[in-house]
UniProtKB/Swiss-Prot annotation:
Organism name: Rattus norvegicus (Rat)
Membrane-spanning ranges: none
Superkingdom of this protein's organism: Eukaryota
GO biological process: lung development; response to testosterone
Region (Disordered): 136-165
Protein name in UniProt: Alanine- and arginine-rich domain-containing protein
Length: 165
C-alpha cells in the first residue's frame, strides 16, 4: 500500500457532510477546546452557533459524550476490579508465605525433638548395655565365689538357687 491508496479518503473528507448545515472541516483544537471534567470524562465544547445550528450534530455529540462516559466508567470499574484482584492475590500470597513459614517452623521443632529422642534412646541403650555387662560380671563373680567356697549343708538350705532341694 502506497500513499496514493488513501486518495479516496481525502476526497471524501474534502466533500463534507451532505445534509448537514455548516462547514465540514478537520477538527482543530483552536475552534474546539477540550476540557478534562472532574469525573474523568472528556467533553468537547463547540461554539454555541454550531450547536444550535444542527440538531443532528447535537444528538451525535450527546451520543458520543455518553459513549465516552460509559467507556470511562467501564475503564474505572475494570481498573478497580484489577486493583481488588491484585490486592486479593497479594493477600493470598502473604497468607501462603505465613503458612509456609509456620510449617517450616513446626518441622524444625519436630526435627529437633526427634534428634533429642534419638539421643535419649542412644543413652538408654548405652545404659542398658552397661547394666547388662555389670550384671554379667557380677553373675560371673558370684559363680566364681560359689565355686571357690566349699558348700556346707546349712548354706545349701539357705540358698535355694543351688538346686539341691
Amino acid at each position: 500500500m502506497g500513499l496514493g491508496d488513501y486518495s479516496h479518503c481525502r476526497q471524501r473528507m474534502s466533500r463534507g457532510l451532505y445534509g448537514v448545515s455548516g462547514r465540514a472541516t478537520l477538527w482543530s483544537p483552536a475552534f474546539h477546546p477540550v476540557h478534562r471534567m472532574p469525573c474523568g470524562t472528556w467533553r468537547i465544547e463547540a461554539p454555541e452557533h454550531v450547536r444550535a445550528s444542527s440538531p443532528v450534530l447535537e444528538h451525535l455529540r450527546r451520543q458520543l459524550e455518553r459513549a465516552f462516559q460509559r467507556a470511562a466508567a467501564r475503564g474505572r470499574a475494570r481498573r478497580a476490579r484489577e486493583a481488588v484482584a491484585a490486592v486479593a492475590a497479594a493477600a493470598a500470597a502473604a497468607r501462603e508465605e505465613r503458612s509456609r513459614a509456620r510449617m517450616e517452623c513446626a518441622l524444625a521443632r519436630l526435627r529437633a525433638e526427634l534428634l533429642e529422642l534419638r539421643f535419649q534412646n542412644h543413652q538408654l541403650a548405652r545404659t542398658l548395655l552397661d547394666l547388662n555387662m555389670k550384671m554379667q560380671q557380677l553373675k560371673k563373680r558370684q559363680d566364681q565365689e560359689r565355686a571357690s567356697k566349699p558348700q556346707s549343708p546349712q548354706d545349701e538350705e539357705m540358698n535355694p538357687e543351688c538346686g539341691n532341694a
